Amino acid sequence: MAADARAEAQGLTTRILELRDAYYELDTVLVSDEEYDRMLRRLEELERLHPELQSQDSPTQTVGGRAQTTLFAPVEHAERMLSLDNVFSFEAFEAWAAKIERDAGRRVDYLCELKIDGLAINLRYENGVLVTAATRGDGVVGEDVTENIRHIPAITQRLSGAGPFPPVVEVRGEVFFPVAKFEELNANQQAAGERVFANARNAASGSLRQKAEGKNPAQRRLMRDRLGRLRMLVHGIGAWPNPPVATQSGVYELLRSWGLPTSAHGRVFGTVQEAADFIGRSAERRDTVEHEIDGVVIKVDELVLHDELGATSRAPRWAIAYKYPPEQVNTKLLDIVVSVGRTGRATPFAVMEKVKVAGSEVRQATLHNQDVVKAKGVLIGDTVVLRKAGDVIPEVLGPVVELRDGTEREFAMPTDCPECGTPLAPAKEGDIDLRCPNAEFCPAQVRGRVEHIGSRGGLDIEALGEVAAAALTQPRFPERAPLPTEAGLFGLRLEDLFPIEVVVRDSETGLPKLTETGVEKVDAPFRRRRQKKDGAFDPEAEAFDGDEIAVPSKSAIELLANLRAARTKPLWRILVSLNIRHVGPVAARALADHFGSLDAIRAASRDELAAVDGVGGIVADAVLSWFEIGWHCEIVENWARDGVQFAIPGHPGPGRADTGGGVLSGLTVVATGSLEGYTREAAQEAIVAAGGKAASSVSKKTDFVAAGPGAGSKLAKAEELGVRVLDAAQFTILVEQGPGALPEVAE
């Protein structure tokens, strides 16, 4: 196999997984659906030509994102939640339908329904009572959002109708904000000075995936208000062995009789042409529907054909999503500004008159680089054509030349970094993008890296978001930022946070907000006015307590507490937070599991790094290059000095985690459900640290299954195969003392 094919496949895998993590974990869309599908199809082609490239965890074999946040307990779906394959033209849809009818050996009926742009949810009912609600996650395990789901008016807690109800049934659907409710939400956010949501899907995901714990009464009321604006429509079933109906449309009728909300827009058609006509009509009236839609889902209506046609590892063959081309509007290009991201890339952004497109208001869009600006032919002051690529990402298509009046002017790419003044330059010869080479101290790059450290894919620090990162790295006062680099992050003190003042900026344009008198608005995020309950200022007190006027705010105290807790986060999260190029959650987990410590990773050769399953040559080169830079090593030294743990306790050493050297040497253990005292990732790391293999599925080779509440098919499989099942307490004994310390199994 050619080395370039392997390198291309590794690069595609890394990028696709990064995009999935951004979409499913961070509620962020980085590329259009068409571009994502192009990358996925290319990876499928490479794996077809070179079967040895395909692995079980390849993006071509998996669904969704990894349910890796620590905010919610993991829930295993009784039946996998698959994704859908996409088509973008009538020709592609007709080709899919022709294959369906060829494989079925007869003409089929098609159920067509509007594709809701929302958050996929799985509702589990037992004997008619809602027991759990979970996000899709990776299709096998999602996040438990049951308590939040109960606040959504459309979701029934107990099925109605005559019954009898099945012992267990999973109902799948989409949670979304109706267009009107989304507009109300953003209006409230703007009035409160809060960041507005980019689109309704982000808002739905962000509202559903929040915790009430730690919030004050006002915050909890706001949270319940958001949840109360959400709606849900169900569009399928999961685990239900023998539904008493013969068609998918019949399933919907049954679900409606149980009091569950289904779409009023679905129709069954007997020919491909009728289905195609429905797709066309729905596109014309998409703005009249209560919720955002980005296409039509077409399903074979007959349930028996679902079994006959089957599914791939990630999508059913009996259904397809027809994705609409994005909507286009005209608006005024007011300016082109350049921003610098955490990698140093200088990116021009179009600042426009606010305009509504594809369901949300837009004021800015990326222009990528100076060559793209030139190729599009846009001038500052132009009326431009704007669309949302994939109905999500704002994209300037070009100018309306006939509307020019002579006042327009060309954009000139700055020669120096707008943030630190360093001359911009390509990273290497031939690159189009310009970058700021001052990676260590450029405040915009430091801000981006600090924000990445706090992200869900990094250390998952709730108090270290966009606002806190900007305050720590680019304050108005003091002149010297508390964090000139991220090296000092874990050494921050209340005294460092207390004096910080920041300019309040518009969440969309990044421009300073002004008071009525035209002065920039200023905020002090880490202090508040002293109140009677705080007591008098004591300058002799040992603990820092502010000054006579103010005390540290809750945000300051929470940030420091979160940072203390983050010092002992799993090694793979620490690795991601170091901002090593190409080292996302997948590669970081592989490196952490294999080597067990940062010292061992640092000491490894290129061949040793590249040989690790899930790493490869591209990541290996990036890791070695990262450690060659002196200030990177200073970050590690400072973090270690401030208590960050760069090793998995008890790990037997490089390559020995699953081959010997621990109490679970040679044993395979599966953890499923909510194990008390363990997150999903912590349970897996405990198995690996003890020398065992942490498997994701149960088989005859499995030695133990640790199961907590919410365990599903894995528990049933273990009982079927006679594999010993442990509770959380027994699991702790197993990983700490080994199987010999477990109590005898009662006969």
From Swiss-Prot:
Keywords: DNA damage, DNA repair, DNA replication, Ligase, Magnesium, Manganese, Metal-binding, NAD, Zinc
Catalytic residues (UniProt): K115 (n6-amp-lysine intermediate)
Cofactor(s) annotated in UniProt: Mg(2+); Mn(2+)
Catalytic activity reported: NAD(+) + (deoxyribonucleotide)n-3'-hydroxyl + 5'-phospho-(deoxyribonucleotide)m = (deoxyribonucleotide)n+m + AMP + beta-nicotinamide D-nucleotide
Similarity remark: Belongs to the NAD-dependent DNA ligase family. LigA subfamily.
E.C. number(s) listed in UniProt: 6.5.1.2
Amino-acid positions noted as binding Zn(2+) in the UniProt annotation, renumbered to this chain: C417, C420, C436, C442
Function: DNA ligase that catalyzes the formation of phosphodiester linkages between 5'-phosphoryl and 3'-hydroxyl groups in double-stranded DNA using NAD as a coenzyme and as the energy source for the reaction. It is essential for DNA replication and repair of damaged DNA.
Organism this protein belongs to: Leifsonia xyli subsp. xyli (strain CTCB07)
Gene3D superfamilies xref list: 5' to 3' exonuclease, C-terminal subdomain (1.10.150.20), 6.20.10.30, BRCT domain (3.40.50.10190), DNA ligase/mRNA capping enzyme (3.30.470.30), Helix hairpin bin (1.10.287.610), Nucleic acid-binding proteins (2.40.50.140)
Pfam family, one: DNA_ligase_ZBD
Gene for this chain: ligA
PANTHER family for the chain: CHROMOSOME TRANSMISSION FIDELITY FACTOR 18, DNA LIGASE
Protein name: DNA ligase
GO biological process: DNA repair; DNA replication
NCBIfam families: dnlj, PRK07956.1
Gene Ontology, cellular component aspect: cytosol
